Amino acid sequence: MTENSASVLQLALRRKTPIFGGWVTGPTVLGPEEFARAGYDYVGFDAQHGYLDDADIAGILRRTEHLPVGTVVRLPNADAAPIGRVLDAGADAVVIAMIESADQAAAAVAAARYPPRGLRSFGPLRASLGVDPADHESRAGVFAMIETAAALAGIHEICAVNGLTGIYVGPADLAISLGSGVVGATRQPEVLEAIVRIQRAASDAGLVTGIHAGDGKTGQAMAQLGFGMITLAAESQALRRGAAAHLREATQ
């Protein structure tokens, strides 16, 4: 892979660690623009829990290609067609939710790779990305989202999957799966122990280690644990916290 063919996300990960991101759940370009202006390194688009369809994601990716931020799309499973579509639309990487086995992780990787290494069909939608399949494949990152007890049990096998870019921890679902509460999940001993195990396994395998932190304080704690890619807030959270801060200032 050349410097010219590398994605913005790949370049960010080469420049520094950790990198920090924001999360977008609705079909608006305001969130990505404001995260970029604030100095965030990447933006994640949520096609699992968010209100974003294929057309929304394709449009937002095109409208934000001038921004100096990487782009990641979270998808609900390793179904090949949606993975191919968002990569064709120009996403730097996909985060595949609820990965619980090496076979599921391998299926996600195969969906992002062209034959003979995978089963992705060639159909680039973004002229700015060119028409070289090798470039398209080399810039497409694949992250396995680790968020269940089953995934924790098989973490070493998952991390050994060839072609996987990294793992991305979902603390809330992981906490639920382990029988713990969602609020303050990363501060609960059992969940924190699991997070540390996941980070170490992925790091030992040479993978990018990502996690959904949800706020700056938790993000700092996750950085101290060695995570290299940390999501700090969704656009709705950032708006709510900012609005609350302004109201406090005005009424104190």
Set out the residue ranges of the language-model regions.
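Conserved anion-binding
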Residues: 81, 91-179
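Glycine-rich, positively charged N-terminal anion/phosphate-binding segment
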Residues: 3-7, 27-34, 38, 51-65, ...
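N-terminal amphipathic alpha-helix/helix-capping segment at the start of soluble metabolic enzymes
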Residues: 1-25, 129-138, 195-204
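Glycine-rich, proline-tolerant flexible connector loops at the mouths of alpha/beta enzymes
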Residues: 31-57, 172-187
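Short, acidic/polar
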Residues: 24-38, 77-86, 149-161, 214-220
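Alpha-helix-loop-beta-strand connector modules within alpha/beta enzyme cores
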Residues: 54-88, 112-117, 135-137, 187-210, ...
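Hydrophobic faces of well-ordered beta-strands that scaffold small-molecule active sites
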Residues: 18-24, 43-45, 71-74, 94-96, ...
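C-terminal alpha-helical cap/extension of soluble enzyme domains
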Residues: 120-129, 146-150, 183-252
